[in-house]
């Protein structure tokens, strides 16, 4: 919306103030403040369709409007921004919000349809694409459709890595690994092959493809130095995944390192496995 603060209009500057207040949780009189911005964005003197769409989206998400109108309002924002600035970060954010609303309303398939409109080839920024793929993967898990879930986790991880979003990449990798360890096969296609050869399927056709051990090893080798910086904590399911990977791949090094540092581990379940 604003290339630089020096080019911003007074309305756009106030819009940035609204965004900062929301991010900081400073919501006192936020309904009145946002309504003022909305009215200004529609006025003859300060008309700004981008600001109008952003304010309407924020007001819907904050529950300022009638709850029965939230979905309609978010859809309006998507359509307006598609016409104004398709493929931008703001358009992608609007799509993400609409997809999340559908999911929270129990409409998983509709959410996936919206997520499918967030694409790098349409211009959407990589971070938005990554967040979309991560959320879509989680929806596929709830539908027990695990092949596309694994592909979307992998795609999300790649987007996050290219955008240097290390925390998000860690999350996507762990969620992928949790699925991958269900079945590992030397004859299974690797993830790059699965992404390259993915094809449309019949709706509701759940699928499962085992993971390739090379992919599992790649992920664990990425995760291991990060997860083992600090082994404390009484609920370390992430370390449990490392141990499972070590056993399944019959690659003892990871487990041996954990045994050497067993005094640092607090999770009783992890301790039981390492001491057995």
What role is predicted for each listed range?
Residues 35-42, 75-83, 116-123, 154-162, ...:
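Amphipathic alpha-helical segments of tetratricopeptide repeats
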Residues 9, 46-51, 86, 90, ...:
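Structural signature of alpha-solenoid helical repeat junctions
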Residues 24, 64-66, 105, 143, ...:
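Structural motif corresponding to the intra-repeat A-B loop/turn of tetratricopeptide repeats
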